[in-house]
Amino acid sequence: YNTPLGSTEIKLPGFTVDTKAPTSVKIKANKSGIKTRSTSSKNTYSKRIKKSVKFTFSANYGTSGKFMTQYKFVPRGKKASKYKWKTANSVTYKKRNKKVRLYVRYIDKSGNITTKKTNGFYVTKK
């Protein structure tokens, strides 16, 4: 049946199966101009950041709760699949003059996954 929040739940004797991926996912940056986007959106790399940028990750994990949040920075012109995921709830990026985009995946305790990315950006000295 569907819960009031729209989650699909399968009731079996003694437990519930959560089949809904995390929702309301956000990649928050402490600098303006970096947005959370779908992984299918076009990559752009025009956003310049001074010194460094800190990202924090949040989501609604639903019935089963949070298992982990993972991220990876992918350089311009490179495929995301070539880079390994790292586990954290936040990360600071400081590498200068390298155009990158950030991918984040949100995983609940039932193994449901939602993946998002940011628009591309690069960090400068001043």
Identify the residue ranges that each predicted region occupies:
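Low-complexity, disordered linker/stalk regions enriched in Pro/Thr/Ser/Gly
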Residues: Y1-K126
